[in-house]
Every structure is written in structure tokens, then in C-alpha cells.
Curated annotation (Swiss-Prot):
The chain crosses the membrane at residues 487-507. One of its GO terms (cellular component) is plasma membrane. It comes from Drosophila grimshawi (Hawaiian fruit fly). It is found in: Cell membrane. This is Protein cueball. Residues 1-31 form the signal peptide. GO terms for biological process: animal organ development; canonical Wnt signaling pathway; oogenesis; positive regulation of circadian sleep/wake cycle, sleep; spermatogenesis; system development; triglyceride homeostasis. Gene3D superfamilies: Laminin, TolB, C-terminal domain. Has a role in spermatogenesis and oogenesis.
Length: 605
């Protein structure tokens, strides 16, 4: 049900925090503007409609209702029917269909209803978790892709799930390594979800994933907190902590398709509340200005604007000349082509402008040293001058380049950086302390001194006081060291020679092991005297010699690969040679003539 109440002429700026018994509105610097809903006792969840500047909230124990609305152009409280015996833990709003969704942990269901028919129709059930023991806690609407996300806080089956706003396509996207998830939010700018997980014990975590549950990352991990709900805008993540009675903030990680860069920082205490616990939180995201050209959101933003204009035009009332003049003034109130919403009395700015009247350009004072343009996504983008860099061109390239108070300058043509060093410093970045380096040379008189150190060493030897040498910052590099000495060279040479010898022995041993053996030739020749001539029919088979007339010669390795270990002689030529030697002196050179030239051929013949 809804309860509408507003008595203030100024609405909240950037944040709204639900404490136990009131809603506090704060500006961008966390300064308190005012507080509302003082007649409530047990506030919990919040939801915000940026199209009509409407904030929705829930009270667990109010006697007249469970869900309420806060709008500034209504001053009379309106009470509608109570939703039932419920315990609303999470709220979410869809501006396209003007439906309000809430998670009822007591009934274990997720309900929804149109804000236009809350007083006349009963809410409908979108998801029923009672049969499976689920405990819906935080919920969030993906306006552009028409999905509803929720956290199941049952520690036995904890999960993060989603379903279409039409009730179809339920899907569990996170179910592993999750303990007790609480609040959840959809960031339309980065197309990711963020949720709080109360870990077992004293720990907690804030995690993130893509809309389908992939690319899961831990953004913040800490302890000794009791986080409940969270909100997100362009710059940071914010969550309520019931233990410390405060709101914490953390820099929003930047994601892209190529690079994921998670900012490494510590959570900051954004807003402490000394007496009351903080529960729900919502923040202004600039949805309608930021996403007018987004591929997924542009059509939704256009439809929401058209519906707002249609509802305003359908109002029938008598207009006088004074009324027409007031209407003209209202239209002129918004600058730079912005649209004026009379019901909420606010402006919807076009891409590239912001402010209450859309009077401030997004590029105003945005780029420090460069030119600014509005990107297709509706964000300011800087084109830096040659000497500067950074998201806003706020950093000079020479920052921190020259060390030890050196002066940095840049070449306009090549953009190269050069350093002019102070006396007694040198190097490309003035990283070398010549005083320290010369002191090292001075302590080793056997080394050759650089010319630049002669004067210093002479003065140093006279004073003989090394305590006056000051230590300066360096770039992580050492100065030139004294040259190596003779004994070190000898040791190095001996080591190289020994290593070479060991390598040679190893190679030779391997060759001996794996080299195939050469074949060995073993032949036997029978040598006998000349056959007897007593018979013309005598043959070697019929006229065998006596044992005293023959001998056997075994020849091994004869002419093996041209290496003759045992000389091989032709038996047919031996007798002729010996008979001729008897007539003249023996000649050693003639022995070569009777060597066997082709042993195998002679044997075959």
C-alpha cells in the first residue's frame, strides 16, 4: 500500500537514507538537507523514481500500511490498503510500466503492483519461493533489459537469481561461494550487478558480476560490519552498515571489454549516524541524462519521456491567460532544450547538460589542459595537449620524471623528456648521485678514478670524513662499480678452461658409446707345397698333401678399412716370390706386390 506525504518545498539532492524512524535527505557532500517521515517507527527499504521525483519506502510495523510514497507536490496524507502480514526487505521500481516490486521475506514471495492501482487492486505474485525455502531479500530492476534480480538469503541455498518482468525465464546466475546475500543493485552505466554478501563469521564482501553472472569479482572484502542495502552512481558504491550506524563508500571500479581495472583502495566512512542504524539507501544516478544514447536504454528512456508528456497533456483543466503565461514561464525555466515536468517541477536535461535548470554544460571546467567533447554515451571526454595526460588532462608528463630536484623539459617536436640535473647529480633522470659514486672510488685507491671525481677525492682525503656524504634518492640503478681485479680474472679463465675440458670429455665418451663397431674379417688359408707330378689326373681332391707338407694361416683384420693390422699375401705368388728371393737379396718393398688385392674374389675362384 502507499502513503503519500510531503510538506517541504525543496526536495532532496543526491542521497536518501532510511534510518529507523525517519528518512534523511543529503546533498553530494553528505550535508543534511532535511528529514521526513517522522511518524514511522521501523523503516527498511527504499526505491526511487527519477522520472517523477518519487521515493518509495517500507515500514515493518506501521498500523496503516507497509509501503509508502513520498512526493513533494502532495501535502495531504493518503492511506491505501495494507498488503498483508508481510515483511518487506527490498523495493524496486520500473518507470516504464510504473510497477513497484517488493520482496516479502515472511511470505517468501516477490510481489508487484502498478502504482496507479495500488489503492484498488491487490498485488500480484511474480515469484513464489515458499515451496523451496527461499528467502528473498534485496531486489533490483534492470530497466533497459526488462529483468528483475533478487538475492536469496537462505544460507543453505543462497543465490542470486533473475527473471523477466513478465514472469518468464527464471535463472540462477550465482550459487557458488555465497553465504547470505542482502542488498543488490543494477548499474546501467557498466551493465553489471553489485550485491552485498554477509559472510560466515565477522566478514562481509561486496561483489560484482556481469548481468548474466559471468566475470564475477570481489570489489570490497572486510570485517566487523553488518551491511544491508547498497546504491551506486557514476563515481562510487555506497552501503549502509547497521553495526557502525553509518554509510560507507568505495570508488566504483571501471570496466571495459578489453581491460578490467579494479581500484585498490580502502572503504571510506561517508556519513556516520551516532544514534540510529542505517537501513535503506538510494542515490540519484542521472539515468535519463546519461543513457539517452545507450544502445540498450535509449528506446526505454524515450518511451518514459513520452509517457510523462502524455500524462501531463491528458490533464483537463481550464487555462486562463495568466495560466498560459505561467505555463510559458515553466517551459522557459529549463534551458538548453530541456523538458519541463510540471508534476514533479523538474527538468530532464539533454545529453551534455546538467543542473536544476540544465544550465551547466558537462564540459564546463572538466578538462584541465585539453578540449572537451560529449561522447556518444553522453559523458564528457578530454583530448589532452601534448604535454599532459589523464582522464581530465590533469597530469603533466614531466611529473616525477626527473629525480633529486632535477628540472624537466619536453621537446615540442619529438615529445621527448629531458632532465637538467643539479650539481653532483647525473643520469637521464638525475638518478645518479655523483657524490656517493666518487666516494666509492675514493675508498679504492687501486682503481682508476674518473676525471669528474679527482677534485672530490682530493678534498675527501684531506678531510677523511665520510659522515658528511648525504644520501639522495635514486631511480633503482647503481652507479659504476670499480673494475674487477686480476685474481678474479684468473679464476674466471680457469673455470672456463675446466668447463671446456669436461664438455670435450663428455662428448668423446658419448661418441665411443654410441659409435658402431667396425666389422672384423677372419679368414683361414691352407698353404701347401706344389702338387706332385706323378699323375696327370691328380687334383686337390684326389691328391691331398701330407700333414707335413701343408699349414694353415688365420688372417684377422686383413686390410680392414685400409688399415692392415695383419698383412695378407696371395698364396699363388708366395712360392714364386720365395724362389726368386733365393737368387737375390730380399727386398721389403716387393712384399707389397704379393698382398691380396681382392680376398673374396680369390677365394671364390
Amino acid at each position: 500500500m502507499a502513503y503519500i506525504d510531503q510538506k517541504h518545498n525543496t526536495f532532496w539532492d543526491d542521497f536518501a537514507i532510511a534510518l529507523r524512524d525517519k528518512i534523511v535527505f543529503l546533498n553530494s557532500t553528505w550535508g543534511e538537507i532535511h528529514a521526513s517521515a517522522h511518524r514511522f517507527e521501523d523503516l527498511s527499504a527504499l526505491a526511487f523514481d527519477e522520472a517523477e521525483e518519487m521515493i518509495y519506502f517500507s515500514d515493518q510495523t506501521h498500523q496503516n500500511g507497509s509501503i509508502f510514497a513520498l512526493r513533494r507536490d502532495d501535502s495531504t496524507p493518503i492511506v491505501v490498503q495494507r498488503t498483508g502480514n508481510d515483511s518487506v526487505e527490498g523495493l524496486a521500481y520500473d518507470p516504464l510500466n510504473r510497477n513497484l516490486f517488493w520482496a516479502d521475506m515472511r511470505q517468501q514471495k516477490i510481489f508487484f503492483s502498478s502504482v496507479d492501482t495500488l489503492a484498488t487492486e491487490l498485488p500480484k505474485v511474480l515469484v513464489d519461493l515458499s515451496g523451496e525455502g527461499g528467502q528473498p531479500d534485496g531486489i533490483a530492476v534492470d530497466i533497459c533489459r526488462r529483468q528483475l534480480y533478487w538475492t536469496n538469503g537462505n544460507i543453505k541455498s543462497a543465490s542470486v537469481e533473475r527473471i523477466g518482468l513478465d514472469g518468464k525465464g527464471r535463472q540462477t546466475i550465482i550459487s557458488a561461494d555465497i553465504d547470505m546475500p542482502r542488498g543488490i543493485v543494477v548499474d546501467q552505466l557498466s551493465d553489471r550487478i553489485f550485491w552485498v554478501d554477509n559472510k560466515v563469521g565477522i566478514f562481509f564482501a561486496i561483489e560484482s558480476a556481469r548481468l548474466d553472472g559471468s566475470d564475477r569479482q570481489v570489489v570490497v572484502k572486510g570485517k566487523h560490519q553488518d551491511p544491508k542495502h547498497l546504491a551506486i552512481n557514476e563515481d562510487a558504491i555506497y552501503w549502509t552498515d547497521r553495526m557502525d550506524k553509518a554509510v560507507w563508500s568505495y570508488p566504483k571500479p571501471t570496466y571495459s571489454q578489453e581491460v578490467t581495472n579494479v581500484t585498490q583502495a580502502e572503504p571510506e566512512l561517508a556519513k556516520p549516524f551516532s544514534k540510529e542504524k542505517a537501513y535503506g539507501i538510494v542515490t540519484r544516478t542521472g539515468f535519463y541524462q546519461r543513457l539517452q544514447k545507450d544502445a540498450h536504454c535509449a528506446s526505454i528512456v524515450k518511451k518514459v519521456k513520452q509517457q510523462l508528456n502524455t500524462r501531463l497533456n491528458n490533464r483537463t483543466h481550464i487555462r486562463s491567460a495568466e495560466g498560459d503565461r505561467i505555463s510559458q514561464l515553466e517551459r522557459e525555466h529549463c534551458l538548453n532544450g530541456a523538458s519541463f515536468m510540471s508534476r514533479g517541477e523538474f527538468c530532464i536535461c539533454p545529453v551534455g547538460f546538467k543542473g536544476a535548470r540544465c544550465e551547466i554544460s558537462e564540459c564546463h571546467n572538466y578538462c584541465v589542459h585539453g578540449t572537451c567533447e560529449i561522447s556518444d554515451a553522453g559523458f564528457p571526454k578530454c583530448y589532452c595537449q601534448a604535454e599532459f595526460y589523464g582522464e581530465r588532462c590533469e597530469y603533466h608528463k614531466c611529473n616525477g620524471h626527473c629525480l633529486n630536484s632535477g628540472h624537466c623539459s619536453m621537446d615540442k617536436e619529438s615529445d621527448a623528456m629531458r632532465c637538467e640535473c643539479r650539481p653532483n647529480f647525473g643520469g637521464e633522470r638525475c638518478e645518479h648521485n655523483l657524490t656517493e659514486q666518487c666516494a666509492i672510488y675514493c675508498q679504492h685507491p687501486e682503481t682508476q678514478l674518473p676525471v669528474s671525481c679527482l677534485d672530490f677525492c682530493e678534498e675527501w682525503s684531506n678531510s677523511n670524513d665520510t659522515a658528511t656524504i648525504t644520501e639522495y634518492q635514486t631511480a633503482g640503478q647503481c652507479g659504476p662499480a670499480p673494475p674487477v681485479q686480476g685474481p678474479l680474472i684468473i679464476v674466471i679463465v680457469l673455470g672456463l678452461v675446466t668447463t671446456s675440458g669436461l664438455v670435450a670429455l663428455t662428448v668423446h665418451g658419448v661418441r665411443l658409446i654410441y659409435k658402431p663397431k667396425r666389422p672384423r674379417i677372419k679368414k683361414t688359408f691352407v698353404v701347401r707345397k706344389q702338387a706332385r707330378l706323378n699323375s696327370s689326373s691328380d687334383t686337390p681332391l684326389t691328391n691331398r698333401p701330407l700333414t707335413t707338407e701343408q699349414c694353415e694361416i688365420t688372417i684377422e683384420n686383413c686390410c680392414n678399412m685400409n688399415i692392415c693390422e695383419t698383412p695378407c699375401f696371395d698364396p699363388k705368388l708366395v712360392e714364386q716370390t720365395f724362389s726368386s728371393r733365393d737368387r737375390k737379396a730380399p727386398c721389403v718393398k716387393e712384399d707389397k706386390k704379393i698382398l691380396i688385392h681382392s680376398m673374396e674374389d680369390n677365394l671364390l675362384s
